[in-house]
Amino acid sequence: MKVIRDCFGRSVRLTDERIAHILQHPELAGMEEEISRVLRAPAEVRVSRSDETVQLFYEYYAKTRVGGKWLCVVVKYPPDDAFVVTAYLTDQLKPGETLWPKK
């Protein structure tokens, strides 16, 4: 298990089970370090509209296995914990309140 300090200074757990789940997606193969990097220094962080305890960390990568895409790392922040749920590549950011960068 890895513990990553996010851009807000919070400790986020990335378990071996979650990283195995994420890397099962062929388009994310070889992007384990990018997942950590997005948490530490994202382009943008938004609150999920479907679950206020979930935040979406985004960074754009011009070269992925499927072309230029946003890498989204999904983190759940229940009381006294924080862990990566999943990560995926996407063409656009989901709507939601922007937490980072601070306006």
Language model regions located:
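Ribonuclease/tRNase effector modules and their secretory precursors
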Residues: M1-K103
